[in-house]
């Protein structure tokens, strides 16, 4: 009799993981980063900001801050400030989601290649993976900086599958939000 994991992996050629909210418990960090950033720029934080940003690539989030919230900083400056605010938390504070390490180990035992597909920056994604000592599981790491169209557009997943050398239809994807 097959267990739940074996059933999920049956017929799959690869597994693709989101990072924030899926492998690591970091979503609260981003609410705090946004609050500090908006305060520094004299802007209020709407109650539904996190919902509106859900699934956007980091560059799309910068566009949202420029075009909707009205912050004039260039996207590169926004990204640098967001990275600065989040970096130490990613290095020292953020923990793995319960069960994530077990899943990675089980998938590795099945010898299925794994990839990351995250909306985050490469610097923060790699910091998180390194801090949790899990970067070695992944053959491919796709970030929001690698794509023009962020999630929920399927391109980041399709490109991760292509780089793994598998058909996207034969991949299992772990995400924490429908927009992802």
Would you name each region that the model predicts?
Residues 2-11, 88-116, 122, 126, ...:
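Short, acidic loop-to-helix structural element flanking the phosphoryl-transfer center
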Residues 2-51:
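Active-site neighborhood of HAD-like aspartate-dependent phosphohydrolases
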Residues 29, 60, 102, 123-124, ...:
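Short alpha-helical
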Residues 37-38, 57-72, 128, 160-161:
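Helix-loop "lid/cap" segments that line or gate small-molecule binding pockets
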Residues 43-45, 71, 134, 165-166:
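Helix N-cap/coil-helix junction residues
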Residues 44-45, 65-102, 110:
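Metal-dependent phosphoesterase signature
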Residues 93-95, 115, 121-179:
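Substrate-recognition "cap/lid" segment bordering the active-site pocket of phosphatases
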